Amino acid sequence: MSAPEPKITPELIASHGLKPDEYQRILDLIGREPTFTELGIFSAMWNEHCSYKSSRIHLKGLPTKAPWVLQGPGENAGVIDIGDNQAVVFKMESHNHPSYIEPYQGATTGVGGILRDVFTMGARPIACLNALSFGDPSHPKTRHLVSGVVAGVGGYGNSFGVPTVGGQTRFHTRYDGNILVNAMAVGLADSDKIFLAAASGVGMPIVYLGSKTGRDGMGGATMASAEFDEGSEEKRPTVQVGDPFAEKLLLEACLEIMAKDCVIAIQDMGAAGLTCSAVEMGAKGDLGVDLDLDAVPTRETGMTAYEMMLSESQERMLMVLKPEKEKEAEEIFRKWGLDFAIVGYTTPTKRFVVKHGGAVKADLPIKELGDEAPLYDRPHVPSPKLPVIHAREVNAPMPVPEALEKLLATPDLCSKRWVWEQYDHVIGGNTLQRPGGDAAVVRVEDGPKGLALTVDVTPRYCEADPYEGGKQAVAEAYRNITAVGGKPLAITDNLNFGNPERPEIMGQLVGCLKGISEACIALDSPIVSGNVSLYNETSGRGILPTPSIGGVGLLDDFTKSATLAFKAEGEAILLIGETHGWLGQSVYLRDVCGREEGAPPPVDLACEKRHGDVVRGMIHAGTATAVHDLSDGGLLVALAEMAISGNIGASLDAPPDSTVAHAWWFGEDQGRYLVTVKEDDLLTVLSKLKSVGVPCTQIGTTGGHTLKIDGERAIDVKALRHAHEHWLPDYMAGKN
């Protein structure tokens, strides 16, 4: 006999993250008091994480269509066509709150969840990326969180067998109490064999696949829709536990039943577990769903209907099966050692009915749970405009060479080798460009094509000016893909913000989305998938607005690509784009001058497109021997990275007389690239760039073992490498 369900009280309602008006909406909708299980189901489906109730109205303005887009937002992942009946399936998603509470398991299950989103669509994962945001290095928890998250990302990806090929790692005090772990997965599928979540047909069996259900992850989606407070450590039991080896078996079994044409619809059990997957499949197919929880495989005794519906145990799928394929599908899953159980059927009623122990535990209208959750147009105010920082008003606290060495050893600009060397970035044998460059390049098997992959955002820009920051995040992804020779095709986004009930935070989200939308349109990069993570606050202190952008581009011929390393001595170094010395919100202004202030650099999207097309053309023509986009740290940091990577120095001209030297070298003007060309090609290249109206300046020549600016002290490339490589391993070893 099951235990009596708790009485529905205002305290119980509030603990489920439901506001009084939302509970009243439930009463109006079903005409009675909900059962405890029904309250849990509404809590899961109507929270921010699953319903997007604060952001959905603004997400509708994003560009999502293009001739090459096969599937846009609304499914498990986005899909783009790359020709030859090949499709790229990709998405990025957050696992922020769990990773702060339990960094290893939070990160592992973040990777596992995004991999399932991709292979649920019928794709074999070929790469993972991530964007990690940690607190101030001096904060007592930061080192522990970095260690746990990086180990978790590597532990899952390495064991599952997918390379982790790129990402971002940043540090800022605003992430002290709320780190960000954004995971991106990319897979390949046949264009004509994409599997979706919408159920079809009445009386079709609904099958539970994968690992057994336990109590781990209880209320995870609701936790991800609330602010943290001082008691957040007590939420450790709500963090899911991942098993990458079980996920590998699930991948192979799912791809096998898909190849055998067994599947009508399929959905992974992620946030809100069985509840969300069943509701979404039924609602998208305009059908009802009847579930019998007595058939659900469990690994703990005495689980209630409430617990089974809200468990977020990992490595599980829900599938609507072709009835005639039941025996064949079951044999496949048994072969792989995984559970296979028919737990329900589709119905024509448009009701979501859950039974357990012979009793009905939930009977709810399915569309209102899924497609028609509450929708808010929350008050929002624009961020105040910050003044432009004029370079001549900023005193240089140290000579340029010393400033460069200091910047290369800062937490944000130092080499992240310590991070990515813990990831297997070459498993599968298709990684052509490893982490540490502008974008990763992964070979598409059985042909000449490659994929360029990147993750980008500059949160301090988004804080200072959300609109320009949103534009810049997309533009930098565009530049990074271009810099390796890829044609940018589409993006996935992961929008991380604070409490949307605060108008200034909602204003950041609205402003960033406006900038992202404009940039996507101008740069022909539609958004095909994404995730929104709100309430990233602890005790009222929010994170920096962090709309991570995951970009995917195509190389028709991966041999026509570029890297950032200087290749040979005696080559001309060209600066493409205009340099005005914009110091506002620059890393130099913050970390050398001690001033985190000013308006961020504006982004001219027409110039971004024009400059990108020209650079890509140079790479494909073979005239560009090395390419690097300019971003954090500006011109001299980018030059140092090229020198370090190629182990070749450079002689650099002094800045133009009309500029301020430190602003010329460290300003963060947008739309710029560094390109090296052979002396024999120089005049032809300069003439070509002039004819198409793209600004270009020769600023030096490669050669030697030092980076030498005319009139300044030379710095040995070995010294630059030491500065660049040592901060992070020393920090993790407790030496700084």
From Swiss-Prot:
To which pathway does this protein belong? Purine metabolism; IMP biosynthesis via de novo pathway; 5-amino-1-(5-phospho-D-ribosyl)imidazole from N(2)-formyl-N(1)-(5-phospho-D-ribosyl)glycinamide: step 1/2
Positions bound to Mg(2+) 1? E93, N531
Q: Does the keyword Cell division apply?
A: no
User: Could you tell me what this protein does?
Assistant: Part of the phosphoribosylformylglycinamidine synthase complex involved in the purines biosynthetic pathway. Catalyzes the ATP-dependent conversion of formylglycinamide ribonucleotide (FGAR) and glutamine to yield formylglycinamidine ribonucleotide (FGAM) and glutamate. The FGAM synthase complex is composed of three subunits. PurQ produces an ammonia molecule by converting glutamine to glutamate. PurL transfers the ammonia molecule to FGAR to form FGAM in an ATP-dependent manner.
UniProt-listed Enzyme Commission number(s): 6.3.5.3
**Encoding gene per record:** purL
Q: Which organism is it from?
A: Rhodopseudomonas palustris (strain HaA2)
What is this protein's record name?
Answer: Phosphoribosylformylglycinamidine synthase subunit PurL
Q: Which residues bind substrate?
A: S94, H95, N96, H97, R116, Q240, E312, S313, Q314, S533
